[in-house]
Amino acid sequence: MKKKGVCAYTQADVKMIRRFKDTDREIFIEMAEEFYNSPAVLHSIPISRHSDTFDEIIKGGCYLDGYMFEYEGQPAGFGVTAKTYSPEAGGIVIWVEDLYIRPQFRSKGLGRLLFEELERNGDPRLKRIRLEVEEGNIKAISLYKRLGFRHLPYGQMVKEL
């Protein structure tokens, strides 16, 4: 599937979502550090992981995508998604790994753009969008519910390697 360069413009180009470009490295790492040092995540991660993530996205594989949000020409946030196939869902599942909007750009409809883009221009076999959200992130939970998300009563377990 061919990836599109620019995804969506709205309101006379006031808000925009587009795929990462090579030149986004510095601003992505800066915003990823903001995100991973915020209450929206359980713990911070080494800065090298942001750089590795960016490299993996720019490499252009079929499993990881990066989206940059802009508002009035300013970097406003980012999204990172991962793609997998799920027998349970019966098709492709997009995991929203990271979704971060800088505080001064929140409640301007930017987060909604990512989900609209995934549904409109994503893989035609897409059956589910999945994400994690901290219980205390009330504004994000409210947005996700308005967009049709529901609580998935699975617990998750991980093993670090």
Segments the model singles out, each with a brief description of its role:
Residues 101, 107-120, 142, 146:
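Conserved acetyl-CoA-binding loop-helix of GNAT-fold acetyltransferases
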Residues 92-103:
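Conserved acetyl-CoA binding element of GNAT-fold acetyltransferases
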Residues 15-30:
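A short beta-loop-alpha structural element at the N-terminal edge
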Residues 66-68, 74-83:
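Conserved beta-strand in the GNAT
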Residues 36-56:
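Conserved GNAT-fold acetyl-CoA-binding loop/helix
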Residues 130-141, 158-161:
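Conserved beta-strand-loop-alpha-helix junction that forms the acyl-donor binding cleft
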Residues 122-132:
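Conserved GNAT acetyl-CoA-binding A-motif
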Residues 56-68, 95:
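A short helix-loop-beta-strand connector motif used in the catalytic cores of GNAT acetyltransferases and
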